[in-house]
A protein has these predicted regions:
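Catalytic histidine neighborhood in serine/cysteine hydrolases
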Residues: 227-244
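Active-site loop/oxyanion-hole signature of alpha/beta-hydrolase fold enzymes
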Residues: 14, 56-97, 255-258
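Conserved alpha/beta-hydrolase "acid-adjacent" motif
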Residues: 216-222
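Short beta-strand/loop motif that positions the catalytic acidic residue
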Residues: 203, 209-211, 215
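Flexible "cap/lid" loop of the alpha/beta hydrolase fold
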Residues: 104-112, 117-150
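Conserved alpha/beta-hydrolase catalytic His-Asp/Glu region
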Residues: 131-132, 136-137, 144-205
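Catalytic histidine-centered segment of alpha/beta-hydrolase-like enzymes
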Residues: 241-254
Length: 258
C-alpha cells in the first residue's frame, strides 16, 4: 500500500509536540480526524468540505511525521491531546469529523465536553463493540489484506491504483510505524471502549453517523448503535460501500455532509 499525503501540509506544535497539520479552506472551523490508514485517497483539505469550512486535519501523534509523546497510550489520551489542540488553536463552535479510529477519538472528545462542538460526524467509527457481529482483526493480516477489507468494490475508489501500489522503503517504514502506534492505542480492549456507550447519552450535539452498509471491518451494527446512543443522531448508511465511504462513494458522502 502506498501512503498518500494531502496538498496542504504544514506543522503545528501541541503541548510541546510537533505534529503534521493539513489546513485549507475558509469559513467556520472543522476538525477532521483520520483513520488508522491515514487519509487515503480522500484529502479533506481539497474536498468540498473546504468550500464551506476551514478544515484542520492533523496527522495523529505517532503517525506519519507527527511526534509520538511517551505518555500517550490510549484513545482517551489522544482525545485529551486533541482537546488541548483545539484550545491552543482557539477553535470555537467547530464541527468534529472522524473516520474509523478517528471517529472513536471524536466520540471520546464529545463525551468529555461537547459544549464547544457545533456538530459531530462519525464515519464507520470504531469505539463500540457490536452485540452480534465482530470487529475484524486487522493486526494479524497483511497490509494488502487490510486494504482489500477496507473497500466493498475497489473499482469505485478514485486513484485506488495509487494506494494499492507497492510502497517505497520509506513508505513501508512509515506504514509499519503507523500500525505499531495503532496497536499501542487500540489493542486492549480491541478497537473499543466498553465504557463509551455509558457516556454518549450526555452528548446533546447534533450528530451524523455515516456508514458503509458492506463495511467488512466494523459492521454497520456499530453505526446503528451509535445512532441510538447519541440522543441527537441521524444514521446515513450507504449501499454498495465498505469501511471508507468518503473514498469509495465520494459523491454520496459529500451529499450526506452537505
Amino acid at each position: 500500500m502506498t501512503l498518500m499525503k494531502t496538498a496542504n501540509q504544514s506543522e503545528a506544535t501541541v503541548s510541546g509536540h510537533k505534529i503534521e497539520m493539513h489546513k485549507s479552506g475558509s469559513g467556520p472551523p472543522l476538525l477532521f480526524l483520520h483513520g488508522g490508514g491515514g487519509f487515503g485517497t480522500f484529502d479533506p483539505t481539497a474536498s468540498p468540505l473546504a468550500e464551506k469550512f476551514t478544515v484542520y486535519a492533523p496527522s495523529h501523534p505517532g503517525f506519519f511525521g507527527s511526534e509520538r509523546p511517551d505518555w500517550l497510550y490510549t484513545i482517551n489520551d489522544l482525545a485529551h491531546f486533541y482537546k488541548d489542540m483545539v484550545q491552543e488553536l482557539g477553535l470555537e463552535d467547530y464541527v468534529l469529523v472522524g473516520h474509523s479510529v478517528g471517529g472513536w477519538i471524536a466520540a471520546e472528545m464529545a463525551a468529555m465536553d461537547h459544549h464547544n462542538i457545533k456538530g459531530l460526524v462519525l464515519i464507520d467509527a470504531a469505539g463500540v463493540r457490536p452485540e452480534k457481529g465482530e470487529i475484524t482483526e486487522v493486526f494479524m493480516v497483511s497490509g494488502d489484506t487490510r486494504l482489500k477489507l477496507g473497500f466493498h468494490d475497489p473499482s469505485q475508489v478514485p486513484s485506488y491504483d495509487v494506494i494499492s501500489a507497492d510502497p517505497t522503503p520509506e513508505g513501508a517504514a512509515i506504514g509499519h510505524g503507523n500500525m505499531e502506534m495503532l496497536s499501542r492505542l487500540c489493542w486492549r480492549p480491541y478497537l473499543h471502549n466498553p465504557s463509551l456507550p455509558h457516556y454518549l447519552g450526555s452528548v446533546k450535539t447534533p450528530a451524523l453517523v455515516v456508514w458503509g452498509k458492506q463495511d467488512a471491518i466494523i459492521p454497520v451494527e456499530c453505526g446503528e448503535m451509535y445512532s441510538k446512543l447519541l440522543p441527537n443522531a441521524t444514521l446515513k448508511s450507504i449501499d454498495n460501500c465498505g469501511h471508507s465511504p468518503q473514498m469509495e462513494k465520494p459523491d454520496e458522502f459529500n451529499a450526506a455532509m452537505a
